[in-house]
């Protein structure tokens, strides 16, 4: 292979799109998240409880104080879930799960940039409804971890896929009386388009 051709191919490889993150950068991601609670959600009113999954639009904003290390805030439109208490009845609730994470984006020379992160989730429950009576679910604070990968479409945009786990437990009352703790602890699968500014 002629040296000039070799250098040309090398230059093309180096110039391949990559979503590199430098100190001072911002990214915004818009997509969808599937919140899938774990299978066993604990006992409410002494009966086994299951909580269904739900998908909603999501938004992430991330600032990079250092190269490849960002502080990310996850937001979403309200998720809605139905809790089924075996032999007793059902209740529905909406929630917002804002999550603040410290994220390390692993630098690579290609289009794929994996990342891992950890932080704190705050889940606010509201609009609880049930034919059984007045239901109240307490807000939750817990650990959140994440991992995923960005596929660069250009030097300013990427397609992101990620998986999160969140520690979400809520004390539940019915008619003012405590009936137990719902252990939600969901896996959250997300797909989004990320833009760098």
Question: Where do the PLM segments sit?
Answer:
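A charged, solvent-exposed segment within the mature domains of Sec-exported extracytoplasmic proteins
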Residues: 115, 125-172
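Surface-exposed strand-loop-strand hairpins of Gram-negative outer-membrane beta-barrel proteins
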Residues: 36-57, 136-141
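Predominantly the C-terminal beta-signal and adjacent terminal strand-loop region
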Residues: 80-83, 153-197
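Gram-negative (and chloroplast) outer-membrane scaffold detector with strong preference
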Residues: 22-23, 32-38, 59-130, 140, ...
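Cleavable N-terminal export/targeting peptides
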Residues: 1-24
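Extracellular loop and loop/strand-boundary signature of outer-membrane beta-barrel proteins
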Residues: 44-48, 84-91, 130-136, 175-181
């Amino acid at each position: 292979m002629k040296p000039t051709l070799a250098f040309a191919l090398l230059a093309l490889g180096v110039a391949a799109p990559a979503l590199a993150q430098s100190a001072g950068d911002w990214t915004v991601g818009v997509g969808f998240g599937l919140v899938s609670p774990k299978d066993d959600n604990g006992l409410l009113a002494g009966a086994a409880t299951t909580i269904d999954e739900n998908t909603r639009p999501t938004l992430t904003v991330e600032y990079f104080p250092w190269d490849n290390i960002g502080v990310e805030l996850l937001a979403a439109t309200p998720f809605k879930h139905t809790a089924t208490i075996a032999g007793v009845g059902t209740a529905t609730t909406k929630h917002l799960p804002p999550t603040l994470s410290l994220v390390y984006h692993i630098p690579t020379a290609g289009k794929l940039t994996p990342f891992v992160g950890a932080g704190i989730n705050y889940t606010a429950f509201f609009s609880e409804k049930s034919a059984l009576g007045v239901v109240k679910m307490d807000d939750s604070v817990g650990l959140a971890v994440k991992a995923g990968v960005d596929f660069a479409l250009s030097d300013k945009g990427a397609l992101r896929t990620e998986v999160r786990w969140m520690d979400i437990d809520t004390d539940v009352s019915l008619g003012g009386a405590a009936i137990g703790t719902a252990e939600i602890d969901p896996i959250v699968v997300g797909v989004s388009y990320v833009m760098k500014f």
